């Protein structure tokens, strides 16, 4: 629809003749527009979005002649009533966290499983987490009391590229929330237009009093708003917000994984340092044994076979030492990469694996749902999928758009920004899809199935999390028992070696018996070191399985 506005400065008789006329009808035809132009009226191009049918108010110069399709008061009341409808409840199902099965206590602590309904007393997506004082908090790696590990861990948060990538992904998701929320508000635009126009002197209904050349100065603004009657926009905001929270949880999970991998690699490296030191000490002992055997052979007190056996054992242990160096270099490179060091110059001086293994506070299984970021991410993704159902359902309802324009138009700069040059209009449009061959039904069903799939993914993440904790607990329990047995084996092997070595030096036994005893001692000592290193790595695995001190209250609101 075109809008007709006064340009001013026309004969009074023309204004009287036009009084009460329906300008909008005349503006629809070329002849009518020409007639209006001849009487000092201007037809503006519609500045509303395409397809919008606005309610127009028309006025002639001086405001004498006017045609109002609807009473302005009634229109404003109707628009206000429509605006109030934006507070209606959004269509589609409201979200509640999927049900899950949680044990009362972990199996490794000796309690049975019970079915727990999804805790949601306040109607929110999460129950309030109440971590006890004994729970892991913040820099959990500090419980190991290793300052070099602390320095490496602290570097991750500021330098790791993978973590920065996760941060940028979260920030992009957060921006999507802002973009979705902006759709709740009107859009505003404004701009001037200054043109000089010439019309044909031979146009229909022209007169000698009608100018053929004139200026057209327009300053106009417009506003457009889609009231969220059915909640489509609110559901979009809900989906974007849940997706952003899922992204934040995934970022926390990346951070947890990196810190845990750093600690695991570090303790594995320290275990190899201990293995290397053991092998170096063994090489020194075997070199002494070889020298002794060679002297005895030269004195006729031992055989050449004993010398060969001593030489073989020495070279075997030297080869093992080289192999440990290969594995250590790989862990050192992995640590340098995680901490974003230049691995061509990065190095960690050898040091023994020291300190008692710290106790990791468990909490109760129901708290695990609030403490693991991967569970939080899966749950938030389920929320986002649920919101998509509401978006799909809203397609069954009409789309309503409100619009308004206002400004000034004149042929004379001196009268441009004045009351008689003002123009304004209000409009509304409702669009309802009548036939889509079942597309909306299909999209709604798709959204529901997507939600169910995401809900099952959440449940699977929960079950896998409990398995992860139980695996780490059982590993720690078994390794602790194995460490005790292995210490006894080391003590027995040490005693056997001492006896054999003394007997050999006293000429009572052959070197083969010493060699057998020393091989058994080396194997048991190496096994003991490996068990201790695995216990530290399993301890880190338990920390990771428990969420590393994170909890769902850290999600952005």
Where are these regions (language model features)?
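Hydrophobic, well-ordered secondary-structure elements that form the walls
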Residues: 368, 402, 430, 447, ...
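Alpha-helical heptad-repeat coiled-coil segments that mediate oligomerization/polymerization in large
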Residues: 300-303, 465, 472, 507-511
